[in-house]
Amino acid sequence: MRREARENKRKLLIRRLLFGLVLLFAAGIGAVFGVNAYVQASVQDRILTEEQAAELEEIDCVLVLGCGLEADGSPSPMLHDRLQQGVALYQKEAAPKLLVSGDHGREEYDEVNAMKRFAEEQGIPSEDVFMDHAGFSTYESVYRARDIFQVRRMVIVTQEYHLSRALYIAKRLGIEAWGVPADPRT
């Protein structure tokens, strides 16, 4: 009988432990979705169309976030889309400057010069394209836009899935920012 009672206690303990783990897992998943929903809701009014962005006033620059190169050093398809959108905003006079921010941490990998080359090939004067060679993450790109390039008001260009996070970071860093998604393929 004692053995049976110990076995029942052990089973009860295992069930409680499993229930606690499932509850903890569900809370973690809920927290992730909750934070994501909060971030998206807090900046939703800052996501604009190209036309709306062109109507903004006193914008310092259009910030194009880097996102990878092909093996030959040309922009990846996603980066190409971002650059096209950034160039279009510049051409519509949404801002007087284009700030390209990306990874140039190794000599053989240089997102920012590839980005600048693309912009120049589209007719943007070299002196209107600023390069941030240390934009290794979204946070670093936005932080450096504020602290290195003295940006106070900007339009951020990235894919829609990434735009809310970039705008939220800008908001938390005290930058007045709007965003335009670069998703011509969807």
What are these regions, as identified by a protein language model?
Residues 37-186:
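A structural signal for short, hydrophobic/glycine-enriched beta-strand patches
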Residues 4-51:
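N-terminal type II signal-anchor transmembrane helix
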